[in-house]
Amino acid sequence: MEDMRIATLTSGGDCPGLNAVIRGIVRTASNEFGSTVVGYQDGWEGLLGDRRVQLYDDEDIDRILLRGGTILGTGRLHPDKFKAGIDQIKANLEDAGIDALIPIGGEGTLKGAKWLSDNGIPVVGVPKTIDNDVNGTDFTFGFDTAVAVATDAVDRLHTTAESHNRVMIVEVMGRHVGWIALHAGMAGGAHYTVIPEVPFDIAEICKAMERRFQMGEKYGIIVVAEGALPREGTMELREGHIDQFGHKTFTGIGQQIADEIHVRLGHDVRTTVLGHIQRGGTPTAFDRVLATRYGVRAARACHEGSFDKVVALKGESIEMITFEEAVGTLKEVPFERWVTAQAMFG
């Protein structure tokens, strides 16, 4: 199909590489097919409120490759409000003459995209998350940048921990999966890594740290994913609360582990929570390339009429997978990967 009118939007948390996807969509649609691209602002809210801008293949689009965040803005929308607005969404897309929609987002966004597809809207999804937890794709863009940021923090904390004879805990993002923690811990030479997929025993962590000190190593680095949980009966956690989207908020698992280590071993323990710094800034070269390839493939899929699909990285190829494969389950860290990392502990 030629001369289409394609819409795109970014939803959920911001992520390095979003602008590269937008750029890939716009340049491919314009240069290869002579099509027009419209961007809805602030995610699903913008689609519901019909807040849109036309995206031109000009210098402004060319320059966004290096920028973090998203030029369209992003946000979250409660699923109930989203589903209640289906008639308005259809009307807005029809009034704007939209032939296809490319939502860019994580698991929640892709579930919303699937629901729109099930309701007759031509959709091609693009997976986005620094957590790397979308199933069916080898990597999501944003993950490499987040790992680079976390690894840099771990690298820097080695010297300060050693100078002060401290145990340093680095808490990274990862509510349900530990890909960032696993990779940053291994790349940064952490002495213990804690991930949600493997409930931890605080006694084992303490033994690993004490063993280091007994061997004459007067410091330790522990990388902890924010969603890590203790093995049942080994440590009592301070409770968080549930936010408006049904997500559990955390009271700082890194600090709770730090407090336990201090009480049990008496060592000076400090915690660094990286938080949203992992989402910001210029994307790495890997993420720019991957995000660009996602945008190009998504635009081509629209012109091929290949809807109700999600772009995905399989080996070296960008392929199309079903929404069911992408959102059916989270891509967790396999236990054997954690065992490999465990060999580097201590």
UniProtKB/Swiss-Prot annotation:
Cofactor dependency: Mg(2+)
Reactions the enzyme catalyzes: beta-D-fructose 6-phosphate + ATP = beta-D-fructose 1,6-bisphosphate + ADP + H(+)
EC number: 2.7.1.11
Main location: cytoplasm
Annotated positions binding substrate: T129, I130, D131, R166, M173, G174, R175, E226, R270, H276, I277, Q278, R279
GO cellular component: 6-phosphofructokinase complex
Source superkingdom: Bacteria
Subcellular location: Cytoplasm
GO biological process: canonical glycolysis; fructose 1,6-bisphosphate metabolic process; fructose 6-phosphate metabolic process
Active site: D131 (proton acceptor)
Gene Ontology molecular-function annotations: 6-phosphofructokinase activity; AMP binding; ATP binding; diphosphate-fructose-6-phosphate 1-phosphotransferase activity; fructose-6-phosphate binding; identical protein binding; metal ion binding; monosaccharide binding
Pathway(s) annotated for this protein in UniProt: Carbohydrate degradation; glycolysis; D-glyceraldehyde 3-phosphate and glycerone phosphate from D-glucose: step 3/4
NCBIfam families: PFK_mixed, PRK03202.1
Reported function: Catalyzes the phosphorylation of D-fructose 6-phosphate to fructose 1,6-bisphosphate by ATP, the first committing step of glycolysis.
Family statement drawn from the similarity comment of this UniProt entry: Belongs to the phosphofructokinase type A (PFKA) family. Mixed-substrate PFK group III subfamily.
Subunit structure: Homodimer or homotetramer.
Name of this chain's protein: ATP-dependent 6-phosphofructokinase
Protein's organism: Corynebacterium glutamicum (strain ATCC 13032 / DSM 20300 / JCM 1318 / BCRC 11384 / CCUG 27702 / LMG 3730 / NBRC 12168 / NCIMB 10025 / NRRL B-2784 / 534)
Lineage: Bacteria, Bacillati, Actinomycetota, Actinomycetes, Mycobacteriales
